[in-house]
C-alpha cells in the first residue's frame, strides 16, 4: 500500500517549480474544467454541517478516510471520464494540476470567506466591535449607579457628576460628612467647656480678631435681644426704658475690641448682659456642668455679688453699683447697661403698675382700633340698656370687654356695665364672678384711686367705679339669699366712707333677715261713744298732728305692715297657682317654660312647646324672654298685688332652675 501523504509531500516540494512552470507554460483548454471540478469535489468532501458562516479563516484541508489516495489526487471518483483522463496524465501534468489546485484552493478559500463573512459583519459587526461596545456599556452603568448613590446624599446631578469625575465615591463622601459632623460636635463641646471655665473664673468679655469670634458676638447680641423682647412682652411697663438703654449700650460695645484671654482655647464671647458670681473653681467638672445655670442671675430675687471693675472701655457694662450690693435684685434679666442708670439704682423698682409713691397712672398701651371698638360697643350697649333691652345690651358690653387688652383699667368700666345688665336678667352668680374680676384690677394703693382711668369717656376715677361695683355685688348676694355676705359687702362700703341711702337701706334689710326684730303686739283701740261735730274733729286732728309729731319711718312701717298683711291674705292662692305650675319639677326648666302661659296672663306671652326647647340655645333664649317679663323692675305699677306676687315667684324659680341647667350643659 502506498503512502497516502506522498502526493502531498511531492506537491509541497515541487511548489516553487510548479509556480515557475505555470508562468512560462500556457495551460491547456481543459485545465480549467479539471480545476473547477477538483475545487467542487474538495468543497463537497471537506465541508461539514458544523462549519459556521461567521468563521474568519477556512479550516485546514484534512483528507477524508473515504477517499482513495491510490488514485490521482483531487480527481472525483464518480466520474469515469475524468478518472481515465487522470490515469493517463503524466506525472508532470499531475504536479502541474496539483499546483494549480493549491493555488486555486487558496484563492477560493479567501474568496469564500470574504463572500460569506461580509454580510454577517455588516449586520452584526465584528468580534472586536462587540467586545469594545460591551465594555463601554458596562462602564456607563457603573457610572450611573455611582452618581445615583451620590445624589441620594442630597447632591445635585451636577455636583454628583463632578465628584465622580474627581474620584470621590459614595463611601468616601460619606466619610467626609461624618468627619465634618464630628468636628462640629467637638467644637461645640470645647466652646461649652471653655464658656463654663470663663464663668467660674469671673473673666471679662472677650472678642477675638478672627471671623468666628465676630460671628459669635453677633449671635450673642441677637440672643440677648430676643430675651429682652420676650421679657418686654411679659413686663411692658418696666421694659420701655430698659430697651432704650440696652440699644445705647449695644452701640457702645460695638465700638470697642475686647481683650483676649489666654486660657480660653476657642476665645468665645462672654455674655454682655449678665452678672456672674466669682465662685471658686470646682474640682469636679460634672459639678460645673450641673451648676452652670445656677451661676447666672435670673428673675428670682437674690443678693448681688461684688463685681470687679475692669480696666477695659466696656467695664461699665458689668459694673454693679455699690448701693445695691446688699439689696435683692428684682428682675435682673432686664438689667440696664447705660451709665446713667448706674447712678439711679432704684428707678426700676418704681415702675410697677400701681406705685404708691407715684402720682401718674402707668397704663397699659392700647391701640386706636381697640379703643374705638370699645367705645362703639359700649355706646350700643348703653342705648339698648336705656330702652330696656338688657339681653342685647349685655352682648354689646361683652364685646366691648373683649376688645380691650388684658389688665387694662378700662376693663373695670366694661365689667361694671356687664354686672348691671346681668342684674336685670337675673344672672346673679355670674355678676358676682365679674365683680370679683373687676375688683382684682383696682390699684393696690389707695392713693392711686384718685387718679382718672385713662381713655375713659366721660372721665372717671377708681373711687367713682368701686362703690357701684360693690353695691351691685351686695344686691346679687341678696337675690341669692346670701344675706350674710351681702351684709359684709355693705359694711365694707361703710368702712370706706360711703354712706349712700341705698347702702344703708341694704344694710338694714340684711340685718332684718339675719336677726329679725320681735313683732310688737298692738293694743286694741276702744271706740268712743261720744259724738263730735266735724269742726271739732278737724280741730282735734290738727291739734294732734301738731302736738304728736309722727316720723316718716313710722308711716313707712305702717305701709309695709299693711302690704305684708295683704300678701299674707293672698299667699295661699298664689302658692296654689305656683305649685300647680311647678308640678314637682322645680329643676326642670323646660317644663317650667313650656307651662308658663297659664300664669303670665297680663302680658303677651307666646306658648312654647317642648319640641321648641330641645336645643340648649333655644332654652336660653326663651328663659331670657321670661325673665324680662317677670323682673321686678319690668313689672308695671298698675299690676295687681296677686300678679306681682306671681311674677316674683316665677322670677326666682326660673333663676334657680337656670343656674342648675347651665351647670348640667356646661353653658357660660
Swiss-Prot record:
InterPro entries reported for this sequence: J_dom_sf (IPR036869), SWA2_UBA (IPR015228), TPR-like_helical_dom_sf (IPR011990), TPR_rpt (IPR019734), UBA-like_sf (IPR009060)
SUPFAM superfamilies assigned: Chaperone J-domain (SSF46565), TPR-like (SSF48452), UBA-like (SSF46934)
Span list, region CB3: 303-362
Misc. remarks from the entry: Present with 768 molecules/cell in log phase SD medium.
Swiss-Prot/TrEMBL TPR repeat ranges: 374-407, 412-445, 467-500
Primary location group: cytoplasm
Function: Cofactor for the uncoating of clathrin-coated vesicles (CCVs) by Hsp70-type chaperones (SSA1/2/3 and SSB1/2). Coat disassembly is important for fusion of vesicles with target membranes and for recycling components of clathrin coats to the cytoplasm for further rounds of vesicle formation. Binds to assembled clathrin and recruits the ATP-activated chaperone to CCVs. Stimulates the ATPase activity of the clathrin-associated Hsp70-type chaperone SSA1, which then disrupts clathrin-clathrin interactions, leading to release of the clathrin coat.
Domain UBA: 140-180
Subcellular location: Cytoplasm; Endoplasmic reticulum membrane
UniProt gene name: SWA2
The J domain, residue ranges: 603-668
Family matches, as Gene3D superfamilies: DNA helicase RuvA subunit, C-terminal domain (1.10.8.10), DnaJ domain (1.10.287.110), Tetratricopeptide repeat domain (1.25.40.10)
Low complexity composition-biased segments: 76-92
Protein name according to UniProt: Auxilin-like clathrin uncoating factor SWA2
Amino acid at each position: 500500500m502506498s503512502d497516502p501523504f506522498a502526493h502531498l509531500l511531492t506537491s509541497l516540494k515541487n511548489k516553487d517549480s510548479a509556480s515557475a512552470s505555470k508562468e512560462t507554460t500556457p495551460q491547456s483548454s481543459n485545465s480549467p474544467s479539471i480545476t473547477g471540478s477538483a475545487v467542487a469535489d474538495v468543497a463537497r468532501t471537506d465541508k461539514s454541517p458544523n462549519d459556521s458562516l461567521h468563521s474568519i479563516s477556512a479550516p485546514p484541508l484534512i483528507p477524508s478516510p473515504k477517499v482513495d489516495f491510490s488514485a490521482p489526487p483531487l480527481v472525483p471518483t464518480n466520474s469515469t471520464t475524468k478518472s481515465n483522463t487522470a490515469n493517463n496524465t503524466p506525472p508532470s501534468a499531475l504536479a502541474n494540476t496539483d499546483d494549480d489546485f493549491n493555488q486555486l484552493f487558496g484563492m477560493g478559500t479567501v474568496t469564500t470567506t470574504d463572500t460569506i463573512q461580509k454580510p454577517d459583519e455588516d449586520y452584526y459587526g465584528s468580534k472586536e466591535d462587540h467586545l469594545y461596545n460591551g465594555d463601554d456599556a458596562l462602564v456607563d452603568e457603573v457610572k450611573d449607579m455611582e452618581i445615583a448613590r451620590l445624589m441620594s446624599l442630597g447632591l445635585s446631578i451636577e455636583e454628583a457628576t463632578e465628584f465622580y469625575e474627581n474620584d470621590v465615591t459614595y463611601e468616601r463622601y460619606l466619610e467626609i460628612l461624618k468627619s465634618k459632623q464630628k468636628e462640629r460636635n467637638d467644637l461645640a463641646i470645647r466652646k461649652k467647656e471653655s464658656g463654663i471655665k470663663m464663668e467660674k473664673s469671673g473673666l471679662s468679655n472677650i472678642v477675638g480678631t478672627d471671623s468666628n469670634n465676630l460671628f459669635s458676638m453677633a449671635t450673642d447680641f441677637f440672643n440677648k435681644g430676643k430675651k429682652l423682647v420676650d421679657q418686654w412682652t411679659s413686663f411692658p411697663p418696666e421694659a420701655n426704658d430698659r430697651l432704650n438703654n440696652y440699644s445705647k449700650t449695644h452701640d457702645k460695645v460695638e465700638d470697642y475690641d475686647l481683650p483676649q484671654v489666654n486660657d480660653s482655647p476657642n476665645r468665645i464671647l462672654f455674655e454682655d448682659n449678665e452678672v456672674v458670681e466669682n465662685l471658686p473653681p470646682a474640682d469636679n467638672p460634672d459639678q460645673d456642668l450641673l451648676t452652670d445655670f445656677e451661676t447666672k442671675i435670673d428673675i428670682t430675687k437674690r443678693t448681688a455679688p461684688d463685681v470687679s471693675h475692669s480696666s477695659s472701655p466696656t467695664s461699665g457694662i458689668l459694673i454693679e453699683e455699690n448701693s445695691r450690693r446688699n439689696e435683692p435684685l428684682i428682675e435682673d434679666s432686664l438689667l440696664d447697661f447705660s451709665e446713667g442708670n448706674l447712678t439711679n439704682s432704684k428707678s426700676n423698682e418704681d415702675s410697677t403698675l400701681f406705685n404708691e409713691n407715684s402720682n401718674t397712672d402707668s397704663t397699659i398701651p392700647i391701640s386706636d382700633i381697640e379703643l374705638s371698638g370699645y367705645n362703639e360697643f359700649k355706646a350700643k350697649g348703653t342705648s339698648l340698656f336705656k330702652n330696656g333691652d338688657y339681653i342685647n345690651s349685655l352682648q354689646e358690653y361683652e364685646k366691648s370687654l373683649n376688645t380691650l387688652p388684658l389688665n387694662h383699667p378700662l376693663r373695670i368700666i366694661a365689667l361694671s356695665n356687664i354686672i348691671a345688665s346681668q342684674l336685670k336678667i337675673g344672672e346673679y352668680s355670674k355678676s358676682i364672678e365679674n365683680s370679683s374680676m373687676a375688683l382684682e384690677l383696682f390699684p393696690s394703693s389707695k392713693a392711686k384711686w384718685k387718679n382718672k382711668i385713662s381713655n375713659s369717656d366721660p372721665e372717671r376715677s377708681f373711687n367713682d367705679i368701686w362703690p357701684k361695683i360693690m353695691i351691685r355685688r351686695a344686691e346679687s348676694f341678696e337675690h341669692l339669699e346670701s344675706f350674710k355676705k351681702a351684709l359684709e359687702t355693705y359694711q365694707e362700703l361703710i368702712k370706706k366712707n360711703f354712706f349712700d341711702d341705698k347702702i344703708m337701706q341694704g344694710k338694714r334689710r340684711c340685718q332684718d333677715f339675719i336677726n329679725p326684730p320681735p313683732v310688737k303686739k298692738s293694743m286694741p283701740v276702744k271706740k268712743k261713744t261720744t259724738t263730735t261735730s266735724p269742726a271739732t274733729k278737724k280741730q282735734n286732728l290738727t291739734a294732734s298732728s301738731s302736738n304728736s309729731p309722727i316720723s316718716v319711718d313710722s308711716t313707712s312701717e305702717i305701709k309695709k305692715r299693711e302690704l305684708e298683711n295683704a300678701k299674707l291674705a293672698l299667699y295661699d292662692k298664689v302658692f296654689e297657682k305656683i305649685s300647680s305650675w311647678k308640678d314637682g319639677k322645680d329643676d326642670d326648666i323646660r317644663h317650667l317654660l313650656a307651662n308658663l302661659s297659664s300664669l303670665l296672663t297680663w302680658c303677651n306671652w307666646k306658648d312654647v312647646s317642648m319640641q321648641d326647647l330641645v336645643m340648649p340655645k333655644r332654652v336660653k333664649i326663651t328663659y331670657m324672654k321670661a325673665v324680662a317679663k317677670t323682673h321686678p323692675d319690668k313689672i308695671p305699677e298698675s299690676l295687681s298685688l296677686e300678679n306681682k306676687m306671681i311674677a316674683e315667684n316665677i322670677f326666682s324659680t326660673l333663676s334657680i332652675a337656670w343656674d342648675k341647667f347651665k351647670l348640667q350643659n356646661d353653658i357660660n
